[in-house]
Amino acid sequence: MVILDGKLVSKQIKQTLKKQIDTYLNKNYKKPKLAVILIGNDPASELYVSNKIKACNLVGIESVLLRFGQNITSEMLSDQINQLNNDNSVDAILLQLPLPKHLDEQEFLQAIDPLKDVDGFHYINQGKMLEGYDTIYPCTPIGIINLLKAYNIDVRSKDITIIGTSNIVGKPLAIMLSNMGATISMCNKNTKSLKKYTKRSDIVISTTGKQALIKKDMIKKNAIVIDVGIIKDPITNKIVGDVDFENVKELCSYITPVPGGVGPMTVSMLLENTFKLYKLHIKENYEN
């Protein structure tokens, strides 16, 4: 059994990225810049944003955090996004989710300029992804794919079950893996026999946030298991995932830990997406 060490791979990605950014800075180009919009004071969102900003600093990406209270109006948020869209110093915009209930997430995700859409949630970027074109990909799905690639795991012709159908992870991941030649089964809360799908799969990817959902008897021998769940165990207060790790790992050929698996990859892909958008803007503003 091999641990898919997202922390290690993420560190390597960040080291490479810093060198690439330094190359641009040595040519007197401006720094890449990420603008982060954080609404309210949700502890999980605060932690995620803090980690993202620290990661930006490590690789030489400038970041600006724009904080707003829980009661921000739609008009105020729309105005702020428009300002960032029109600010040539900003290469990428991150709207930290979830938003308060009175704000329509899709409305504001679609308001972000697709050429500044660091999360890859804009319909234009998702349409390109659907058609198999190079684009800005959602961070967690592309992080999972790059983690598999780092361990030379080829998904072509693999039977893959994805549990969870969110627009952030499950759906885009299914499209991307399908475009790479995998056979995909998608399961949700209405799936009658989850075990029927997972037991036959070469790769099982769980994205539900339900502790210990995936148990040993649901996995075939030498399967690859990817755990996207992040849950605080109410008894131990430790961070755990969807997978009963200690028991499931006995059967796996590869498995991601929680923490230290998919999470670090998501952050490093945010950095890569920011740099990708930066390069587009450099080409547009400096080289044309």
Swiss-Prot record:
Protein name from the UniProt record = Bifunctional protein FolD
Q: Which GO terms describe its cellular component?
A: cytosol
Could you tell me which InterPro entries the record lists for this protein?
Aminoacid_DH-like_N_sf, NAD(P)-bd_dom_sf, THF_DH/CycHdrlase, THF_DH/CycHdrlase_cat_dom, THF_DH/CycHdrlase_CS, THF_DH/CycHdrlase_NAD-bd_dom
Q: Which domain of life is it from?
A: Bacteria
Positions of transmembrane segments: none
Is Oxidoreductase given among the entry's keywords? yes
A single GO BP: purine nucleotide biosynthetic process
Supply the source organism for this entry: Mycoplasma mycoides subsp. mycoides SC (strain CCUG 32753 / NCTC 10114 / PG1)
Q: What does it do?
A: Catalyzes the oxidation of 5,10-methylenetetrahydrofolate to 5,10-methenyltetrahydrofolate and then the hydrolysis of 5,10-methenyltetrahydrofolate to 10-formyltetrahydrofolate.
Give any Pfam family that matches: THF_DHG_CYH
List, alphabetically, the PROSITE patterns matched. THF_DHG_CYH_2 (PS00767)
